[in-house]
Amino acid sequence: MTVPENAQHTAPDQTQHTAPDRTRQAQQAAPDTAGRRLIELMAGFWKTQAIYLAAESGLVDAIAAAGRAPAVELANRTGTDPDALGRLLLFLESLDVVSGEDPAGYALTPVGELLRTGTQDSMRDHVRIYGSHFYRAWGALDHSLRTGRSAFTEVYGSDLFRYLNQHPDLSLTYERAMVAGTPFFAQVPEVHDFSGARLIVDVAGGHGALLHEILKSCPEPRAVLFDAPHVIAETADRPIASEHGDRVTLVPGDFFEGVPQGGDVYLLSRILHCFDDEACLRILAHCRSAMAPGGRLVVVERLLTRGTGSSLAQGYNMHMLVVLGGGRERDEDAYRTLLEKAGFQLDSVTTLPLETHLMAATLRR
């Protein structure tokens, strides 16, 4: 076809795309987007181990001590290879754990600050146990998938709680990690009224971090912190003992055998999700029989919800399978049914941060 001489030519980069062109481009972009997303999901272990080693190697503490430092200096401080550490720092910068670049050096971001040793809001112990023992257990996910049993037990030859009892250093890390993952504890006494309580029994309360927050806000009640003997032995220098020693009794024991008597409030914070329904009913039965007339039960757990968005509860539901075998997260209806079978009625459900909920229950009439 002959083009008239006076016709205006359209530059190639100004050509208007037709509908088929746009459809073709969208089809080409979709696999790239999906492929990138799949790679990011598949390589999640890159992030886990990078963050774990940033804490475990002393890198984060070295950066904190220097304020800002280049890779070579940080390699000298941590006894690592300068090139390898430089690569790790670049990756951590992409994850928003550190900021900066060489030669000016790297500093910690707010995320990186959470990996420091000994700071008030530190999540270092959380990262340490997830990046080591739990990481190895997840490597045996196929065992849990085939058998429905704990991959942790398969890898370490012992269930988690027996293993912690046999390894005091890890037990201490675990209990500190459990506190590090609970920034919502301070809000519990804000959303639930403990002022009328006379005796609060915290069942399997660890080092007493939740009980500490409750007693700080409510000066009237006395309390019992009840947990395994090796856990109770670790609480001597914790705030629950040092700040509330005259109000708190530390009691070692096994909640499958019984719980301390006479409480009018029994706390179960992130305990029931560790066990199957049968074991939960045993724990709840002991709480019911020990409870003073008119007593109540306070349960803190993540609740499963339906939806396609990101959900910590869905991830922890898998984590309970891998690490504990019989453990599981449950939805509100499942907890209501469980409580009713144990002789309680669910009175209220209150939302807390990190997809956690406080469920208050009383004895059924």
Curated annotation (Swiss-Prot):
GO terms classed as biological process: antibiotic biosynthetic process; methylation
Comp. bias regions, Polar residues: 1-18
Keywords: Antibiotic biosynthesis, Methyltransferase, S-adenosyl-L-methionine, Transferase
Annotated S-adenosyl-L-methionine binding sites: D227, G253, D254, F255, R270
Record carries keyword S-adenosyl-L-methionine: yes
GO molecular function annotations of the record: O-methyltransferase activity; protein dimerization activity
Name of this chain's protein: 3-amino-4-hydroxybenzoate 4-O-methyltransferase
Protein's organism: Streptomyces cremeus
